[in-house]
Amino acid sequence: GVIPCGESCVFIPCISSVVGCTCKNKVCYRN
């Protein structure tokens, strides 16, 4: 939840969710 994955999730889900990233405030974060 604190490390930006360098991906936005405004229109599509986080592709980086496969490595544990989740959408928060339209940006993908992990941990």
Curated annotation (Swiss-Prot):
The keyword Disulfide bond applies. Disulfide bonds join C5-C21, C9-C23, C14-C28. It comes from the Eukaryota. The keyword Disulfide bond applies. This is a cyclic peptide. Contains 3 disulfide bonds. One of its GO terms (biological process) is defense response. Keywords: Disulfide bond, Knottin, Plant defense. There is a cross-link at G1-N31 (Cyclopeptide (Gly-Asn)). Pfam families: Cyclotide (PF03784). InterPro entries: Cyclotide, Cyclotide_bracelet_CS, Cyclotide_sf. The presence of a 'disulfide through disulfide knot' structurally defines this protein as a knottin. Belongs to the cyclotide family. Bracelet subfamily. Probably participates in a plant defense mechanism (Potential). Binds to and induces leakage in phospholipd membranes, particularly ones containing 1-palmitoyl-2-oleophosphatidylethanolamine (POPE). This is Cyclotide mech-6.
